[in-house]
Amino acid sequence: MARKPDPGRRIVADNRKARFNYEITDTVEAGIALTGTEVKSLRGGKATIGEAYAGPSGDEFFLFNAYIPEYLEANRFNHETKRPRRLLLHRRQINKFLGATQREGYTVIPLKIYFNERGRAKVELGLGRGKKLHDKRETAKERDWQRDRARLLRDKG
C-alpha cells in the first residue's frame, strides 16, 4: 500500500534513479537560494533533478545541472534554467561533504526538492557511492523477488 503524503511537505521533484544508481549512506536537508521566478516555477511543480549533483565551489556548496524551467508569466527578468544554485548548509555539514567527496570517493546527490511546512524550498541531499553493474542487478533481483512474494502471499490468503 502506498504511503500517504506528508500534509506539510509537498514534493516538487524526486530523483528516483538515485537510489538505484547509488548506495545512499546519509541524507541531509538543505535550503536552496532561489530567485522569485524560480520559486514560482517550482510551485507549479516543474523541476528536473535527474542529472543534478551538488559540489563545492570555493567554500560553499552549489546544486549544479538542476533544471527549473522559466516561469511563463514572467517578463524579461526571468532566470537561467540550469544555473548553479547555492545550497544553505551549516559549516560542519559542508566539511563533512567535502571530506567524503575528496577522500572517500562519495558523491552528493539531490534526492528531492520540496516545500516544507513553512513554505520554504528545501533539497534533500544524499551522500552516496556509485553502484557497480552487479550491485544494480542484485537490487533489481531483490525488488522482483519482493514483488513475486507479495503476489504469492496475496493469492494464497
From Swiss-Prot:
Keywords for this protein: Cytoplasm, RNA-binding
Main localization of the protein described in the UniProt heading: cytoplasm
Gene3D superfamilies cross-referenced by the UniProt entry: 2.40.280.10
Coiled coil residues, start to end: none
Localization (cell): Cytoplasm
CC annotations in GO: cytosol
Pfam families assigned to the protein according to its UniProt record, in alphabetical order: SmpB
CDD domains found in the cross-reference section: SmpB
GO molecular function: RNA binding
Annotated GO biological process: trans-translation
InterPro entries in alphabetical order: SmpB, SsrA-bd_prot, SsrA-bd_prot_CS
Entry superkingdom: Bacteria
Family: Belongs to the SmpB family.
Function: Required for rescue of stalled ribosomes mediated by trans-translation. Binds to transfer-messenger RNA (tmRNA), required for stable association of tmRNA with ribosomes. tmRNA and SmpB together mimic tRNA shape, replacing the anticodon stem-loop with SmpB. tmRNA is encoded by the ssrA gene; the 2 termini fold to resemble tRNA(Ala) and it encodes a 'tag peptide', a short internal open reading frame. During trans-translation Ala-aminoacylated tmRNA acts like a tRNA, entering the A-site of stalled ribosomes, displacing the stalled mRNA.
Alphabetical list of PANTHER family matching this protein: SSRA-BINDING PROTEIN, TMRNA-BINDING COMPONENT OF TRANS-TRANSLATION TAGGING COMPLEX
Protein name, as recorded: SsrA-binding protein
Organism: Methylobacterium nodulans (strain LMG 21967 / CNCM I-2342 / ORS 2060)
